[in-house]
Every structure is written in C-alpha cells, then in structure tokens.
C-alpha cells in the first residue's frame, strides 16, 4: 500500500515539474527569448501578487522568466534561466535562482550556476560556481568558485577559490586560494594562500603565503612565509619567513628568518635570523643572528651574533659576537672582539679591545679586555694585558699600565697604575 502511495506522489511531482517547465518554455516564447519585451508575462495573480511566467516588471510571489529585461521590482522567488539584459534599474529581493541572476540591486538568497551580479548592491547569501560581484557593495555570505568582488565595499564572510577583492574597503572573514585584496582598508580575518593586502590600512588577523602588506598601517596578527610589510606603521604580532618591514614605525612581537626593519622606530620583541635595523630608534628585546643597528638610539636587551651598533647611543644590555659600538654606550656591554664609543658608562667587557677614540671622550665604570685604549678620560677600574689612558681618575690592573698625564716616573707601571686627578 505504501509503495503504491509513493509511486503516486512521484508521479504527481513529475507532472508538476513538467507543467512548470512547459510554462517556463512558453514564457520564453512569449518574450521572443533573445529580445524580451517588458511587461510580457502570463500571470496567475491579484494586484501583481501570485505566480508569474514571463518578463513581469513588478511582481511579488513566485516568478519564472527566461531572461529579465527592464525589470523594476521583484519580491519573492525569482527563477531565471538566462543572464539579464538592460536590467540595471531592477530591485530584486528574496530568492533568486538561475544561470546568472542579475539586477541593479540583489538582496536575499542568490544562487547562480555561473554566479550572481548587481550593478549596485549585492547582499544576503550569495553562491556561484564562478563569480559574485557588484558595482558598489557586496554584503553577507558570499561563496564563489573563482572570485568575489565589489567595486566599493565588501563585507561579511567571503570565499573565492582564486580571489576576494574590493575597490574600497574589505571587512569580515575573507578567504581565498590565491589572494585577498582591497584598494582601501581591509579589516577582519583575511587569508590568501599567496597574498593578502590593501592599498590603505589592514587591521585584524591576516595570512598570506608569500606576503601580507598595507599601503598605510598594518595592525594585528600578521603571518607570511614570505614577507610582512606596511608603508607606514606596523603594529602587533608579525611573523615573516623572509622579512618584516615598516616605512615608519614597527611595534610588537616580530619574528623572521631573515630581517626586520623600520624607517623610523622599532619597538618590542624582535627576533631575526640575520638582522634588525631602524632608521631611528630600536627599543625592546632584540635578537639577531648577524647584526642589530639603529640610526639614532638602541635601547634594551640586544643580542647579535656579529655586531650591535647605533648612530648615536646604545643603552641597556648589549651582547655581540664580534663588536659593539656607538657614540654613547650606557649599561652592560659584552663583545667577542671589541667595543667602542666616545662616551661609555657602565660595565664593558671584550676579549680583544675596548676603545675611546675621541680626545674629549670619556669612559666610566668597569672595563676589561686584552687592550683598553682610552684617548680621552677614564673614570673607574680597568683590567687588561695593556691599559692605556690619556687621563685617569681610578685604577688600572694589567701587565702594562699607561697614564699619559701622570708624572714621568709613573706614566708606565707594571701590574697596577692609578691616578685620581680631577
């Protein structure tokens, strides 16, 4: 008995599909398919509400059409088989299904075999095997086999197997097999297996296989196997396989296998396989396999495999495999070969030498190396094989100790020499 009932239901459903298909075909015939005329339709409706077959310009309910042409407003379920023509004024709301649903404004659920497009705005749940796009804004959940794009703003959850892009701003969760990009701002979670970037600012969690970049500021958690960069300021947690850089300031936790750099100031915890550098100040905890440098001031804990240097001053704890130097050095300094400056304060240690080149320079505190050479003034204690100072206010301990301004008999002394002249 149940089998007989099921067969009857299938038969009725098949008959209904046949009737709907026939009516849809007739609607296409009514419109002369390739040149549809506005207003030509077969309607079962009251006050433009009900069921329509054809190119009805204004309708509410269930509507079937071969191809939309000069449509004004449709609300409900709109099923079209062929891409629209001259339909930029149309406002379609509800469920739109077809090869390529098109209108001036599309809102609701839009399902297209190829995709869906709007001359102005596209909003809602939009699905297309190829692409989704709007001349102005795209808002909602947008999933396309190839790409999702908006001439102005793209907001929501967007996925494109190849690309996701917006002419102005991109906001939300944006995922792409190749690239995610915006001509203006990009805000949210943005993932492009090759790249993610914006012409202006980028804020949020951003991943690009080769690179993540912003023309202005880049803020948030940013990661790339290639590089992470910003034309102006870069702030947050940044991981770049090759490098991390900012045209102005770089702030946060930054790690890369190659280099980290900023045009102005670099602040935070910075880890680089090769080098760390800034045109202005470097402040924080910095580790580099080769070198660390700052155009002006270097402050904090700085550890480099080869060298640490600054155009003006180094302050804090500095450890270098070969050398460390700046015009002013303050704090605790250790160098494998040599350390130098014109004004050195604190504790300074080197296996090879410690040097003050300027006759008006000064070193104060504790210094220890094989050769301590102070052409200016030394205040404090020095330990070395050879200690040389132009002026001394303190004590030298070494094999040979030389103080230039001591009396002749006491200029050169073995083991110990001292002077406490003001």
Task: Give the ranges of each region predicted by the language model.
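Bacterial N-terminal signal peptides
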Residues: 15-27
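Intrinsically disordered, low-complexity regulatory regions of eukaryotic regulatory proteins
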Residues: 7, 32-33
């Amino acid at each position: 008995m149940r089998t007989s009932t099921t067969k009857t239901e299938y038969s009725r459903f098949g008959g209904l599909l046949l009737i709907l298909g026939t009516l849809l075909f007739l609607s296409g015939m009514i419109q002369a398919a390739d040149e549809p005329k506005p207003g030509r339709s077969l309607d079962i409706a009251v006050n433009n509400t009900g069921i329509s077959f054809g190119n009805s310009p204004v309708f509410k309910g269930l509507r079937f059409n071969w191809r939309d042409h000069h449509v004004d407003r449709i609300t409900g379920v709109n099923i079209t088989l062929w891409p629209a023509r001259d339909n930029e004024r149309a406002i379609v709301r509800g469920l739109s299904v077809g090869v390529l649903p098109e209108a001036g404004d599309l809102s609701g659920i839009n399902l297209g075999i190829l995709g869906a497009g709007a001359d102005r705005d596209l909003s809602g749940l939009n699905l297309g095997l190829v692409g989704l796009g709007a001349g102005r804004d795209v808002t909602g959940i947008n999933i396309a086999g190839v790409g999702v794009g908006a001439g102005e703003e793209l907001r929501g959850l967007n996925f494109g197997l190849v690309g996701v892009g917006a002419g102005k701003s991109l906001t939300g969760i944006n995922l792409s097999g190749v690239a995610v990009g915006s001509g203006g701002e990009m805000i949210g979670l943005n993932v492009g297996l090759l790249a993610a970037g914006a012409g202006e600012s980028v804020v949020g969690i951003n991943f690009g296989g080769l690179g993540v970049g912003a023309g202005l500021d880049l803020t948030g958690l940013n990661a790339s196997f290639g590089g992470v960069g910003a034309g102006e300021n870069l702030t947050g947690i940044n991981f770049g396989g090759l490098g991390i850089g900012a045209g102005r300031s770089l702030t946060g936790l930054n790690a890369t296998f190659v280099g980290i750099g900023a045009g102005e100031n670099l602040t935070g915890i910075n880890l680089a396989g090769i080098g760390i550098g800034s045109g202005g100040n470097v402040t924080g905890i910095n580790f580099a396999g080769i070198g660390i440098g700052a155009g002006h001031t270097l402050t904090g804990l700085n550890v480099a495999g080869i060298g640490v240097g600054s155009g003006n001053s180094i302050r804090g704890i500095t450890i270098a495999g070969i050398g460390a130097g700046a015009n002013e050095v303050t704090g605790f300094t250790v160098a494998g070969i040599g350390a130098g400056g014109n004004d050195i304060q604190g504790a300074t240690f080197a296996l090879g030498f410690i040097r003050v080149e300027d006759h008006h320079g000064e070193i104060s505190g504790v210094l220890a190396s094989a050769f301590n050479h102070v052409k200016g003034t030394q205040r404090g204690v020095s330990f070395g094989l050879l200690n040389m100072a132009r002026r001394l206010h303190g004590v030298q301990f070494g094999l040979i100790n030389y103080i230039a301004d001591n009396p002749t008999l006491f200029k050169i002394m073995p083991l110990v020499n001292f002077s406490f002249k003001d």
